[in-house]
Amino acid sequence: MLAKRIVPCLDVKDGCVVKGVQFRNHEIVGDIVPLAARYAAEGADELVFYDITASAHDRVVDKSWVSRVAEQIDIPFCVAGGIKTIGQARELLAFGADKISVNSPALSDPSLISRLQDEFGRQCIVIGIDSFYDAASDSYKVKQFTGDEAATKETAWYTQDWVEEVQKRGCGEIVLNVMNQDGVRGGYDIKQLSLVRQLCDVPLIASGGAGTMAHFRDVFIEAKVDAALAASVFHKAIINIGELKQYLAAEGIAIRL
């Protein structure tokens, strides 16, 4: 059995790591490189960095800190933020990123996924999906440009349909960001993640809602995800990654210690 992965997420804005609640009201958490080094030392399996306003403001993630992170850590990391061309992706990979993730740019131009896959191979192409549960229609819908509250907009895609589309186009991994759960630490959305898991032939990463160690256990066992991403519980030192992994191993979950 493949080991499950623990993935701290660092949202970056104006050169600092920030964290919001339900994608709003972001507060500064700390500096990028020291936080990355801390999580690597604690035992994170990989890191994800989102330049959260890049797509909404029509720019690409700042490469200067990407190279500094690559020099400081020895675990894989993924970078996202406004990547719209093969050249931009190539540059970020050359600066040391192991994977690149696209979200809003893929919604604007789905062919980007196929082009990235053709150029670099699907193993380093991650698709982020910002999924919002709409109670009125009892459905999951995809939102775009979520890094800037003023720029956030609805798309025509239902989450399940977009999950199938991005796989057809060649993504290697999917991060499902459950917007309703983000930052509230009430647990992952097991129902939605389980639904997506049934449609997903590539690795699925759960994002949004981690508050306790049991939440990680539950999402691995019940939703059968491949990795669990979290931010605020790590930023606020509510959960130590090494202790989390010991707990999960004791609960019978395959994990790298």
From Swiss-Prot:
UniProt key word Lyase: yes
Q: Where in the cell is it found?
A: Cytoplasm
Q: What are the GO cellular component annotations?
A: cytoplasm
In its keyword annotation, does this UniProt entry include Zinc? no
Q: Which UniProt keywords apply?
A: Amino-acid biosynthesis, Cytoplasm, Histidine biosynthesis, Lyase
Among InterPro entries, the record links this protein to: Aldolase_TIM, His_biosynth, HisF, IGPS_HisA/HisF, RibuloseP-bd_barrel
Give the molecular function GO annotations: imidazoleglycerol-phosphate synthase activity; lyase activity
The main location is cytoplasm
Pathway this chain belongs to = Amino-acid biosynthesis; L-histidine biosynthesis; L-histidine from 5-phospho-alpha-D-ribose 1-diphosphate: step 5/9
- Organism of provenance: Shewanella sp. (strain MR-7)
From the Swiss-Prot or TrEMBL record, give the protein name.
Imidazole glycerol phosphate synthase subunit HisF
Q: Tell me which HAMAP family the record gives.
A: HisF (MF_01013)
Q: Name one GO biological process term.
A: L-histidine biosynthetic process
Subunit comment: Heterodimer of HisH and HisF.
Query: In this UniProt entry, which cysteines form S-S bonds?
Result: none
As recorded in UniProt, its EC number(s) are: 4.3.2.10
EC class name: lyase
Organism superkingdom:
Bacteria
| Pfam families linked to this entry | His_biosynth (PF00977)
Q: Which family does it belong to?
A: Belongs to the HisA/HisF family.
Instruction: Report the function annotation for this chain.
Output: IGPS catalyzes the conversion of PRFAR and glutamine to IGP, AICAR and glutamate. The HisF subunit catalyzes the cyclization activity that produces IGP and AICAR from PRFAR using the ammonia provided by the HisH subunit.
Q: Which reaction does it catalyse?
A: 5-[(5-phospho-1-deoxy-D-ribulos-1-ylimino)methylamino]-1-(5-phospho-beta-D-ribosyl)imidazole-4-carboxamide + L-glutamine = D-erythro-1-(imidazol-4-yl)glycerol 3-phosphate + 5-amino-1-(5-phospho-beta-D-ribosyl)imidazole-4-carboxamide + L-glutamate + H(+)
